[in-house]
Amino acid sequence: MPNYVELEKNIKNIIDDLQGLCNTNGLSNTASEEIIVTSVFLYKFLNDKFIANLKKFADEMEVSIEDVKKNKDDLLDAFYATYSQDVAFTYEDTIEYLVGFLGEDNFYTKFEDALIRISNYSQNEDFSIETADGEKKPLFTKIISDYLPTAKRNDFARNIFSYITTDRFDFGETAEGNYDFFSTIFEYLIQNYNVASGTYAEYFTPQALSSAIGKILVHMAPVEDKIYEIYDPSAGSGSLVLHLANELGNGKFGNKARVYTQDISQKSSRFLRINMLLNGLKESLKNIIEGDTLKSPAHFKVEGNDSSGLKQFDFITSNPPFKTDFSSTRNDIETNWKSTSRFFAGVPSIPNAKKESMAIYLCFIQHILYSLRPGGKAAIVVPTGFLTAQAGIERKIRQHIVDNHWLRGVVSMPSNIFANTGTNVSVLFIDKTNKDGEVLLVDASKLGTKVKVGKNQKTVLSQEELDKIVNTFVKHIIEEDFSVSVTYDRIKEKNYSFSAGQYFDVKIEYVELTQEEFNSKIQEYTNNLDKLFTESKSLEYEIKNSLKGLKYDF
């Protein structure tokens, strides 16, 4: 049984070393650092998995590894067929082979050539990222010659190999690692590169919150014996949708889900691919699209045929960007979909100033409702202000949800649940089967412990608090000042407010007093009033006398 605590420590050390190497070469806090660190990490993971599988296959076939490498009796072809879900390597692409060339003057080119070969193998075509216009982006690029001057390249490559050799650490030991293990590693890998800065599609949902949202969604109905199609239209690095896939499979990743995503960010799409590869989700990689979801959605009822209409999904989960400048595409979004109900409540107008404040999340909510199958379920992270806004698109959306009886509940989260934004957030849970049921509104805003993360303050929910939120929602528990169950009619009476606090009972506290205590209280209040009245009269007298002393000078 592997020591996962030690494995995690070793993996994090390698990530730290790679970041330190970039720093000493003047690449710290640059886009090139992110590409180098994540690419080397991915190469190391895929290499070790290939070698581990090669050894396992040779043992099962009772042959030597050398016979498999040489493709004796077509053994290598049989190996590729057996492990078709993994990225294909040849032995010449491996760390074990390349270390034999460390002393050569052009070592870095040997390494980069291996990366390009891996990307170009026909077996690896499905591991490319596709853009909305059909372009394929490979697994690897030239991560050294593209970013470093010639004089530094060999030393840089040799340092990389000093960190990733198998005698220091072998990813093959993590073959049985579960999603929780890999999600922790993945979060550490990208923590410096995936900042929720407010720009489009750069949001990262904390793993614990993603897990809680996934649990609630899955427990909203019994899981059937089928493959569910699940979707995130603003996927970022995939935390939300992959936690949902894991929950649907009851910890057996991908057993119950086919994942579909789209995201405009190149960086986030790269991160998502790494996340998928760590968890062996090759079947869904072809559904990971880089592109503008609102302007050019990429998933259709008939694959590749936009005239067939947008594809609908069993589950949708999303933490969309709240505000960003999309003025350059706003009119196209409105015009192209005018004949449909995709944006039934409207598209935010372009303001004269502060275009970066355009509420793009309102378009994502409408897109999600449009893309959800009859009987489908969704979770959407929104700014808490959306719950009570009484004008414009916000209210129209809430009214549409309530009038169609699609709301299952809302959970209002503590402030600063995301370290890089102070915006208060809530999670809408949509259920198109909740026609006659009641709606549960949860106010979890007082939970959590405040901690310092860098220069920012963050609220961290304990596992006990997360379990309380999940259990309260799933079991529809009513708790004073925490959760309340309301009907659709009552929500209409409250102007379609989704805020739990507006439905809590107002409590008036009564204190039992004796006749003597009552008389004493009244006398105390009377004395205080008499004192205040006396002071008031004295002040009035002083002001009038001061006014009499004023003279007109000219």
Each predicted region: which residue ranges?
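Non-catalytic, mostly N-terminal accessory regions of nucleic-acid modification and defense proteins
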Residues: 1-212, 217, 221, 284, ...
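A conserved structural/catalytic subdomain of Rossmann-like adenosyl-cofactor enzymes
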Residues: 2, 300-302, 307-554
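Non-catalytic alpha-helical coupling and interface elements of nucleotide-dependent molecular machines
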Residues: 41-45, 169, 190, 194, ...
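A short, mixed-charge helix-start or loop-turn motif at secondary-structure junctions
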Residues: 195-196, 254-255, 347-351
